[in-house]
Amino acid sequence: MDLLQLHCPPTEAYYRPEVFDALDELKQAGKIQHYGVSVEKVEEALKASEYPGVATVQIIFNIFRQRPKELFFPLAQKRDVGILVRLPLASGLLGGKITRNTQFAADDHRSYNRYGERFDRGETFSGVDLDVALDAVEQIRRIVPADVSMAAFAMRWVLQHEEVSCVIPGARNADQVIENAKASDLAPLSSEQMQMLTKIYQDEIRPLVHQRW
């Protein structure tokens, strides 16, 4: 196996060296080439990066979840840890097609976990209240060029950060896969666009989520 990742183990697992010793043994036995973790919080990413064998960290990072770039990204770059970004569109919010009238299926986490009823709230809409998020989406929409989809624009923002190794967007059909792939072909966002997006985050989103994840 090329890469084995532990998906969102409880925080205490990162403080148990024997967990990572076991992964080292799998690597030494030739069962896996590399291993990493998928985390909920920046704290977990920082702790995981202390283990020399950790090759990758998968983390939520998007326009609505910017804390990882403050502490974790510089450390990951220093220690040569690959960053795999999941939920780059904040559960579809940053695709620009969700409205207050959107109905989600009963088995869709955007229906049953909006407030963290089943698992970590940060996994659904990046932990942002839907009404607040939709207002912010409308502000972002005004920044997106007319010939670019909002989804591609949002992922281009993620790719703008050189520490990011790979982006893992979700897709429900082939058209969405094609649209997602266009993000890598877009020109970098301008400094003005980046500043405007930062201001939206600072004003609307940061007070709600920044210290939680």
Q: Each predicted region: which residue ranges?
A:
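Active-site phosphate-binding strand-loop segment of PLP-dependent enzymes
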Residues: 4
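Beta/alpha (TIM)-barrel catalytic core signal, keyed to glycine-rich beta->alpha loops juxtaposed to Asp/Glu
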Residues: 8-202
